[in-house]
Amino acid sequence: VNXNTPIR
């Protein structure tokens, strides 16, 4: 998963 991209 990409922790740099905030999934909202």
From Swiss-Prot:
Highest taxon, organism lineage: Eukaryota
Protein name (database record): Unknown protein 5
